[in-house]
Amino acid sequence: MLILVSPAKTLDFENPAATQSYSIPTLLGQSEQLIDVCRKLTPSDIASLMKVSDKIAGLNVARFSSWDSDFTPDNAKQAVFAFRGDVYTGLDADTLSEASLQKAQQQLRILSGLYGLLKPLDLMQAYRLEMGTRLSNARGTNLYQFWGDIITDEINQTTAAQGDEFIINLASNEYFKAVKHKQLTANLVTPVFKDKKNGQYKVISFFAKKARGMMVRYILDNNVESLDALIKFDSAGYYYSEAESTVTAPVFLREEQ
């Protein structure tokens, strides 16, 4: 199975990665085209476009300016160790064994506004370019139009080469919209995580993001290769609810924390 996750806004380029192994992003040529567009933006353009403070806008101008596609471990970092959001807290990649990291390299893909699709050990340089950004480019007025079929084709090529029967979608709606799901050749499964609050089970963003990362970790640690094995996910008190689930959307519940 192939797993899809979102990137994170929070980045860590200070601490060293937990491995020296690395790879280079497949779609780097596309990234260069986007960088060329972004380098023409002023700090005020970026503040308006990305709805960020002047300070963050200035930081991103500097990042776009210094971005260099000749990635090395000295000027870039492996994606799974560079991202530091709720999903990545749940995954806790720093404690993965080398064997699990290599398994992740095969099974896990990170959707990205700038890089399109990243393998965990792909080197990347710091950036902020969310998939929902309305960035005018040569192919349209936003990043969904820029990426078009490119990400979907890359996913299909990967699942075909690896013989993956399932795609486990653990990405946010914003990022998964970059995938043309009707064109996917493997079976799509989108797990749902609900926490009990005030007597009702509901999707709570913070908990759901962390649960997505924990499910990635569970798949890697337990060599999960089937849906029967996937629904045994029980990290942090979650349990499978057959009553609420469908084949394509297994639901996992957790009592009030």
UniProtKB/Swiss-Prot annotation:
GO terms for biological process: response to hydroperoxide. Transmembrane segments: none annotated. One of its GO terms (cellular component) is cytosol. InterPro entries: YaaA. This is UPF0246 protein swp_3736. Disulfide bonds: none annotated. Belongs to the UPF0246 family.
